[in-house]
């Protein structure tokens, strides 16, 4: 097996990492009292870590598999550099999401080291582009062996907490929602990410502006809007068949091939990046792949987290989405649970959720007091 092939298929998985020894982490806002940390476990196709500690508070993490091969990957990394949260929702196969899980954070660390660890929008954007170029190189090297690798891609949602600022970078249609305390004690749901999906009218106009000479840049097909009638998302890592003409030809499947010459990339790997100064009323963040948001509103998700203990928050959100998926199909949740992967995809997508609770005292000083290079490194299981 070639070195590139070994590199591509290396497992996006580590033993579930040691966490920062932080007894104060339970005192932050949002959710119920933490009551300590809970371990990871499995329940059928569901993997979860009920409660963990990062250097700015607590987090909860869960993923459920629906596809024959799990296409979602995710990670939480925390240390003296701040905190990095990633959700990678693959499509066409698992390879791009696994590659991003293995490489995006490493590129982020290498690039931020050039500026003594200072994090900026440029730092994050460069990390995305370096990851895209790395995956493109593998697609090129393996073109003769695995041409369909050119049709694999992944959405990317990244949150970086650096000092008292949250950076959110997004490609595709995963979403992060902030639970923010109001003056009267309630919580509001504030979406912080941009979704690059052709079903969004703003994205259709963006694509038309970028491709004024192509009346077929977005096509309504099978009940949804798609870029060139093929794919719903307009930005991703991977999907080289939509970005480089040398990968849009035989032997990839006819359904992926564009009839007319490709004058410019049809999709982008440049993320939309938002910077949000953290406020004491910012209680928690819900990072999730679009499989969750197909079934839960932003407000409902925030309500669920707010009204229950922290432990198991991510798992609780996934189960709420599954209950809703079952209701839509007029079936019982207990019957949905009996359906095996692959067939399960007809009822819901792979779903990844990471809930990050914000302890503002710890966030303010954590990057100073942390003495280890990386004190938390958690990645979701590769398969269930």
Swiss-Prot record:
The question of whether Metal-binding is a record keyword is answered with: yes
Bilayer-crossing residues are none
In terms of SUPFAM superfamilies, this protein maps to:
PP2C-like (SSF81606)
Q: Name one GO molecular function term.
A: protein serine/threonine phosphatase activity
Q: How is the cofactor bound?
A: Binds 2 magnesium or manganese ions per subunit.
Per the UniProt record, which EC number(s) apply here?
A: 3.1.3.16
UniProt cross-references to CDD domains, sorted A to Z: PP2Cc
Instruction: List cofactor names only.
Output: Mg(2+); Mn(2+)
Loss of this gene results in the following: The pp2c-d1 pp2c-d2 double mutant displays a long hypocotyl phenotype and strongly reduced apical hook maintenance in etiolated seedlings. Plants missing PP2C42/PP2C-D2, PP2C64/PP2C-D5, PP2C79/PP2C-D7, PP2C63/PP2C-D8 and PP2C68/PP2C-D9 exhibit an increased hypocotyl length, as well as an enhanced sensitivity to LiCl and media acidification.
Under Pfam families, the record lists: PP2C (PF00481)
Q: Which residues form the PPM-type phosphatase domain?
A: 58-358
Alphabetical UniProt keywords: Hydrolase, Magnesium, Manganese, Metal-binding, Protein phosphatase
Reactions mediated catalytically: O-phospho-L-seryl-[protein] + H2O = L-seryl-[protein] + phosphate; O-phospho-L-threonyl-[protein] + H2O = L-threonyl-[protein] + phosphate
Q: Where does Mn(2+) 1 bind?
A: 89-90
- Positions binding Mn(2+) 2 in this chain are 89, 290, 349
SMART domains, A to Z: PP2Cc
- The answer, when asked if Metal-binding is one of the entry's keywords, is yes
Task: Quote the function comment for this protein.
Answer: Dephosphorylates and represses plasma membrane H(+)-ATPases (PM H(+)-ATPases, e.g. AHA1 and AHA2), thus influencing negatively plant growth and fitness. Promotes the apical hook maintenance of etiolated seedlings.
Tell me its family: Belongs to the PP2C family.
Name it.
Answer: Probable protein phosphatase 2C 42
Species, as recorded? Arabidopsis thaliana (Mouse-ear cress)
